[in-house]
Amino acid sequence: MCSPTNFLYEPFSSDAVTQNYDQNLKCTKCGAYYSMACSLREQNVWTCLFCNQSNSNAELPLVPSNTYTLTSAKKEILSRRTIMIIDAICDPHELNYLVSILCNNYITRQQEPLSIITIQQSGHVILHNAVNHRRDAVFSINEFMTKYNLDKLNASYFEKKISEINQESYWFDKSTQGSLRKLLREICKIANKVNISSKRDKRCTGLALFVSSVLASQCSLSAYCHIVSFLNGPCTKGGGKVMSRERGESMRQNHHFESKSSQLQLSKSPTKFYKKMLEKFANQSLIYEFFIASLDQIGILEMSPLITSSMAVSQFDSFNDERFAMSFQKYLNLRDHNAIYNCHSKIMTAKNAIVVKDFPKYSLNPKNLSLPLEISLGHNSAEAPIQFQTTFENQTEKYIRIETLLLPKANRSFGAQNEIVFSMKKIASRIIDSFAYSSKHTKELMKQLFLLPNQIRGKDVDMVNLIQWCYHIYRSPILSVRNTSPDERYLFLHRIINASKDTCLSLCKPFIWSYSDLKHDWIVLDVPLTRAQILQDDKTTICVDGGSYLVLRRGKLLEKEGRELCCKLLNDLQRFPQPLYVETKTGGSQDRFLKSKIIPLDITDKETLGTEDMTFNEYFNLFTDLSGSK
């Protein structure tokens, strides 16, 4: 039997020529649509690619295209609301900066209803009233009924308390912007400094997220609600708790997944809580997004049921960080101009196809969407047609996009990079979907990675190059926990799932930009990160783009030009979440960060870097031994 073809469908990756279609372009027998590959038997008569039915049409498309789009204008603009959860357990100076960003960037452009919820140090969660703050809805984790109903996810208890006052009074609009600014300033005034005590603060993140979901559920089913959380630490009380209040107890680490430790059990409980919470509001169009002012873990791994995209989480050292201001501005621009909702894609014509991971319904940046498919195409011809239908909407219109592609047969190769990206997405999906982060499960996936080169033998693929890419996957947080916390690894896996092909490759094997005197421009070098380029050369300035980070290694030459290139890459709207930016020089304090990203190719590299990692030579020998034993 012919092995399936691995394919990545990226419907929004480029601005391809599209045109509106009409029903005359639809096959009368199977329902497939006309494409450029359809043969013309005579004038205005075309043969369907999928069933060979002859179809007549008075006017065939004038613009040659395989992509057709049906656009329907909506009767009303997309109904959208926003709930902001502000963690007030924060340094006052930092909270002031967050509030100034919200006032200057969001409130000035506010077009939709906004609600404010704060997480207080005392274990209180406050839903603020837009008309009279004395009528705020206050929920305390210290009250038995609140904690009991939260654990039971009893929404009616919270609905009753919210509905004691007209629930619309909890929403700020353009007419109440003055009250909103006043409220935000008041939140800063009453926020206490970090509490120095024997226990951690009562931070009830789960309670705040549940209250916000209940409030959003009382709106129209057709309304989309963004629940945007600005967090400063992990949940320590109530549903969603990921860390003990005892300062001697730490959050779970990678090694806790190897045993039935108390930290691991504490990790599973909030995951179950958020999973049930998501199921409870499944009929609502709720979108959870997080801005986190802490590079430490706060429980993103446990919140995984709420996170549908890597773009839903942005993490910084603090809200004072310039990267936060830039990232939040990008977020607003993408949400207003690029985001799509209610996205679904299906294969109209291929029966033997398996979707590895569906598109998320909401995408902040659809150009990154990639649908990995395993398609059995058979043996008959050199090429096989396949047709996709993707439906989505933005703030003003609804779309149906039909796209026809010709796929090469399984005995022809897409190239090593396509196979690698597909494998990355497949492995990442399996880890996230099964919540399996133990080394035992990792070893099972490692075996699949070793088998990949053997599975595509006979194809036109550079096998050594393919094995090198497999080694990069082995060294990445997909399969390695080296220098990576559970939260960081989870976000990395989500980036892989939601990233375009090029971004996936940079996450796996960083791009190295260097200036070419021949081309008078910056180019990507096809060389590995080795000691020759990174650890010894102190003359040449290079830029290392690892997808989630950007490192400028300053040399004696072209330092200014290198910084300009980095600024250009950082300011690209499509780079979201905002990459971490690091500048270093030979022997500089940030050299350790860059060295942690370097793979040891041989024993000399291993000794220079002081790492226990398997070198590429060792990996290649292991692969050769395993292949020879089969």
UniProtKB/Swiss-Prot annotation:
Q: Subcellular location, in the record's words?
A: Cytoplasm; Nucleus
Gene null: resulting phenotype? Leads to a significant growth defect in the temperature-sensitive SAR1-D32G mutant background.
Any one GO CC term of this protein is: COPII vesicle coat
**GO MF annotations in UniProt:** GTPase activator activity; zinc ion binding
Q: Which InterPro entries match?
A: Gelsolin-like_dom_sf, Sec23, Sec23/24_trunk_dom, vWFA_dom_sf, Znf_Sec23_Sec24_sf
Source domain of life is: Eukaryota
Coiled-coil blocks = none
Q: Name one GO biological process term.
A: intracellular protein transport
Q: What does this protein do?
A: Acts as a GTPase-activating protein (GAP) for SAR1. Contrary to its SEC23 homolog, NEL1 does not associate with SEC24 and its homologs, nor does it associate with the COPII components, suggesting that it is unlikely that NEL1 functions as a structural component of the vesicle coat machinery. May function as a signaling molecule.
What family does the entry list? Belongs to the SEC23/SEC24 family. SEC23 subfamily.
- Protein name from the UniProt record: GTPase-activating protein NEL1
Q: Which organism is it from?
A: Saccharomyces cerevisiae (strain ATCC 204508 / S288c)
